[in-house]
A protein has these predicted regions:
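Membrane-interface aromatic/basic loop that binds lipid-linked glycans or pyrophosphate carriers
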Residues: 252-313
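Amphipathic alpha-helical repeat scaffolds of TPR domains
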Residues: 236-248
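A conserved acidic beta->alpha catalytic loop
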Residues: 3, 20-30
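Donor-binding/catalytic cores of nucleotide-activated saccharide
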Residues: 51, 72-184, 191-203
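Short, acidic, metal-binding catalytic loop of nucleotide-sugar glycosyltransferases
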Residues: 2-13
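Catalytic core of nucleotide-sugar-dependent glycosyltransferases
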Residues: 186-195, 201-229, 245-274
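Conserved donor nucleotide-binding strand/loop of the catalytic core
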Residues: 14, 28-63
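Short aromatic/hydrophobic "clamp" motif used to bind/position activated sugar donors
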Residues: 67
């Protein structure tokens, strides 16, 4: 939270909207002194409606020309935002996409004076160029991007209420619908790393359904008019990445075959024509998902067992 106010910006020129999603911990108490010290902070309280609803409500309340959506547990690098905002205001770009660092808690604690060096440089691209050249489907992070508010509202971009993985369809839709964009390797955020194993361990049917909904909404983007073939192919490949993530989580965290079947049926109802055709791996996976899901999981379990056996040779 404090890193937001270390950006070299005049507080009269921007607003900070805090959406309290019915937190049960002491988060709001911890930042009471920060709220009291800054007149440009607005607090919105909601009853545990999910991060996606919190973001939608924050966007609806925003008045500024550009919107940044940092996560509460991540950090902005000191004085990293102003060059991006200046370029955004100068070019009226729909999106300004920056780079970030991944660090663990111990690394963050030891990095007391982390800043960019030199000047930020930018490359102008269209949204579809950005999609093809820069979007990693495993890193659909909305907090690394400045969004022009009129672009979000004009294109009716919203986060799917009540689900996790909402960044995936939102980021894909934003890139595909954007006009002028600016890309920079300037570092904006520090992404707090270290909870990946916990995410796998806590995966359950609700999260599986959420991922299915995210896959379904991303799949519907294929209906956009005049998508170049290269864009359509990458979109299909990106959806396959999300589908593979679903399979991985189900394999390691959903043990009951009836639960796995229910999740697949849930996905089939939302994407009846889900099919992947780029390469042998996609074709085989797609065929087994559609016609032999139990056999597919059996082979995946055997492969998991074989590759995890200790080598005594």
């Amino acid at each position: 939270m404090e890193s937001i106010f270390k950006q070299g910006l005049d507080e009269d020129d921007y607003e900070v909207i805090i959406v309290n999603d019915g937190t049960k911990d002491r988060s709001m108490e911890v930042i009471e002194d920060i709220i009291a010290a800054h007149a440009n902070i607005t607090v919105i309280n909601q009853e545990n409606l999910s991060l996606s609803v919190a973001r939608n409500n924050g966007i609806a309340a925003a008045k500024g020309e550009y919107i940044l959506m940092p996560d509460s547990d991540d950090l902005l690098i000191e004085n990293s935002l102003k060059p991006l905002l200046d370029k955004a205001l100068e070019t009226k770009a729909d999106l300004v996409v920056a780079d970030f660092l991944e660090m663990g808690d111990e690394q963050i604690a030891q990095s007391t004076d982390l800043q960019n060096s030199g000047e930020a440089t930018f490359v102008e691209k269209t949204g579809k160029q950005l999609f093809l050249e820069d979007l990693n489907p495993r890193q659909c992070y909305v907090w690394r991007t400045l969004y022009r508010r009129a672009f979000i509202t004009g294109k009716k971009l919203t986060f799917v209420p009540g689900i996790r993985y909402q960044d995936v369809p939102f980021t894909h839709e934003a890139y595909l619908k954007a006009g002028k964009c600016m890309r920079t390797h300037w570092l904006l955020n520090i992404y707090r790393r270290g909870h990946e194993s916990a995410a796998t361990a806590s995966f359950n049917k609700k999260k599986a359904h959420d991922l299915c909904i995210a896959i379904a909404k991303t799949w519907r983007l294929r209906k956009m008019k005049k998508l170049p073939l290269s864009v359509r192919q990458k979109l299909d490949d990106d959806i396959f990445v999300s589908f593979s993530l679903l399979i991985y989580f189900m394999l390691y965290s959903v043990k009951d075959f009836s639960d796995r079947e229910e999740i697949f049926n849930f996905l089939r109802k939302r994407v009846p024509k889900l099919k992947f055709t780029h390469g042998v791996k996609q074709r085989v996976t797609s065929m087994m998902y559609r016609f032999m899901p139990h056999v597919y999981f059996f082979f995946r379990l055997v492969f998991k067992w074989v590759t995890s056996k200790p080598n005594f040779g």
